[in-house]
């Protein structure tokens, strides 16, 4: 009987010690879209393993139906069915929070910089306002190069845009031109 009491106390102590840690894990999982590090990995089982996620960017212009997203020497990793968020990642520009939902059915291998234009110009994605959680609809992603700066424009189409052209796009390190 005494042994049973000792074991019970031991199990209770373990439970008390472990529970806060488990709560932290659950909390992180629930809010993981806001805690994606600037440097890190997101598991993508559809595209063979972990892919680097590095966010450098800012919204430089906002008009009624489009955003100009200024990206630096790293691009975002888009994973179908996942929501990847950039939060407070701007440098000399205004801090932003931007979410992208990527949908589709085809996985494109890691791209070289010479392949970006033709792929991005045929890529659709969802843009979402992270603060109001308002889905803005299907956007056509367009690429624009100006000297050493790469811009991607997400322009809301007046016509329905097919959002199943790609499953995922991985933009690895893009050297400055």
Swiss-Prot record:
Location in or out of the cell: Endoplasmic reticulum; Golgi apparatus
UniProt main location, coarse: endoplasmic reticulum
Cystine pairs: none
Signal sequence interval, chain numbering: 1-23
Residues bearing attached sugar chains per UniProt: 121
Taxonomic superkingdom: Eukaryota
Record's keyword annotation contains Endoplasmic reticulum: yes
Single GO cellular component term: cytoplasm
Claim: Glycoprotein is one of the keywords in the record: yes
Keywords: Endoplasmic reticulum, Glycoprotein, Golgi apparatus, Signal
Transmembrane segments: none
Entry function: Has a role in meiosis.
Protein name from the UniProt record: Meiotically up-regulated gene 121 protein
Gene name linked to the record: mug121
């Amino acid at each position: 009987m005494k042994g049973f009491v000792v074991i019970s106390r031991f199990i209770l102590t373990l439970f008390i010690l472990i529970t806060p840690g488990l709560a932290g894990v659950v909390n992180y999982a629930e809010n993981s879209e806001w805690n994606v590090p600037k440097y890190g990995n997101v598991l993508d089982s559809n595209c063979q393993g972990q892919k680097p996620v590095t966010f450098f960017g800012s919204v430089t212009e906002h008009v009624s139906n489009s955003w100009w997203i200024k990206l630096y020497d790293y691009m975002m990793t888009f994973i179908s069915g996942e929501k990847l968020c950039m939060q407070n990642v701007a440098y000399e520009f205004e801090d932003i929070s931007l979410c992208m939902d990527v949908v589709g059915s085809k996985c494109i291998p890691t791209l070289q910089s010479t392949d970006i234009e033709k792929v991005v110009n045929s890529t659709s994605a969802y843009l979402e306002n992270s603060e109001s959680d308002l889905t803005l609809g299907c956007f056509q992603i367009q690429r624009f190069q100006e000297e050493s700066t790469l811009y991607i424009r997400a322009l809301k189409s007046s016509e329905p845009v097919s959002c199943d052209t790609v499953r995922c796009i991985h933009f690895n390190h893009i050297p400055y031109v």
